């Protein structure tokens, strides 16, 4: 049995391509390309080599660490994530990340990290 208000309001089949995003922006070494389907935002995020949230997005976000939750699939490269509580992990291709607010992240190695993130509402930074 579904809880009231948990079902999506999907009325028709939809298709979009991240190679033709509805919204795109670059902050330092981090690029974001977003499409929106109903209430779901799908964002391809590219952390170039040397990218670090606290250096590339901190000033823009206005917070000491990223305060947005993330659910994402890593497609290529590696990403190190350190939470405000000190816990940390490294994510590689095929890994699913589920991060609560309060973290920093940066690329590991000499390959950009690309991941696709799924969010709803205002769970992503807009330029």
For the regions a protein language model found, what residue spans apply to each?
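Glycine- and acidic-residue-biased ligand/ion/polar-headgroup-sensing regions
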Residues: 59-85
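Conserved short histidine dyad/triad with adjacent acidic residue
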Residues: 44-65
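Short acidic-glycine-tyrosine-enriched beta hairpin
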Residues: 83-102
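Short beta-strand segments in beta-sandwich/barrel cores
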Residues: 52-53, 77-82, 105
